[in-house]
């Protein structure tokens, strides 16, 4: 009976040791499985980190490229703004110059018109400015005690001999020929300013008749 009891106790210990061994092997297998899964997950994480770093590098390159493009664009816009401002300033200066030029032209025109009026009244001469600069056409009124004498004239501006003869005649009638010549010159200037686009072919030959020498002998046409 004692032997049976001892064997039973031994079997129990053997069984307990076997069960414990099985449990340890099961735990070891579970740990190995968990370690493998962890290593697999760690490898996936490492690969994900590598891909992430690559994506970050690509993104950084794109950001740098966009930044450089933006800096170039900003620089271009600044240069363009400076050029626009410089153009505005040039236009302002040009407009002011044009304004001053127009003012001087108006002033000169008013001075000429006033001089023409004064000389016309002083010499009693009316100049047909529509005929200028090709022709010197008009009439001089010689005031007398009993009646006025009209001295009409119609000559080509290039007819130096005819103009010389006319000036000699006016001079003989005590008309201030220098004033008469100045009147014709100013009237010619006004006419050429009024029709600058279509000058006559011989306009360059229309010299001021102020150059006529009154001391030279009269040449009859």
UniProtKB/Swiss-Prot annotation:
Its main location: nucleus. Keywords: Cell cycle, Cell division, Centromere, Chromosome, Coiled coil, Kinetochore, Meiosis, Mitosis, Nucleus. GO terms for cellular component: Ndc80 complex; nucleus. The keyword Cell cycle applies. One of its GO terms (biological process) is cell division. Residues 63-114 form a coiled coil. The keyword Heme does not apply. It is found in: Nucleus; Chromosome, Centromere, Kinetochore. Component of the Ndc80 complex, which is composed of Ndc80, Nuf2 and Spc25. Acts as a component of the essential kinetochore-associated Ndc80 complex, which is required for chromosome segregation and spindle checkpoint activity during meiosis and mitosis. Required for kinetochore integrity and the organization of stable microtubule binding sites in the outer plate of the kinetochore. Participates in SAC signaling that responds specifically to disruptions in spindle microtubule dynamics. The NDC80 complex synergistically enhances the affinity of the SKA1 complex for microtubules and may allow the NDC80 complex to track depolymerizing microtubules. Belongs to the SPC25 family. This is Kinetochore protein Spc25. The gene is Spc25.
